[in-house]
Amino acid sequence: MSIPHTKRICQIIKLKAEAVDAYKAIHAAVWPGVLAALERAHIVDYSINHYPPLQLLIATMKYTGVDYEADMKSVAEDPETQKWWAVTDGMQESFVEGAQGSGTDIPWWTEVEEVFRFEGKSL
């Protein structure tokens, strides 16, 4: 069931083939400060999936706040998150022309359009 005022987000990026093991390892123990910054920015139900044939990372999350741009700016300004991105951005290849890394004016991850949703209900 949807949380009122929830924005669903899906993003993609390419994972460098040589970075698969390191990327999975660092995400097995995400730094607490990074998670805290996401939580302060009203990000919930966040997951990243890997599709090996295309080396595609697919991130899904829900935003439950009221000012998405301001909350994303607060994440980008968080020192622990900036250190995290300094490590993880080098493992990825953006699909966005001109992108230089996370937290800049040009998005690093590509946001993709939702074309179907079924929420159903538990029986």
Predicted regions and their residues:
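Short beta-strand
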Residues: 47-51
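An amphipathic, aromatic/His-enriched active-site/gating alpha helix that lines ligand/cofactor pockets
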Residues: 37, 41, 63-108
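A generic structural motif
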Residues: 55-61
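Active-site-flanking beta-strand signature of metal-NTP-handling nucleotidyl enzymes
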Residues: 8-14
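Eukaryotic N-terminal low-complexity, Ser/Thr- and Lys/Arg-rich leader segments
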Residues: 1-4, 120-123
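Terminal substrate-recognition subdomain of acyl/acetyltransferases
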Residues: 111, 115-122
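Solvent-exposed residues in well-ordered beta-strands and their adjoining turns
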Residues: 14-16, 62-64
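Short amphipathic alpha-helical segments
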Residues: 19-44
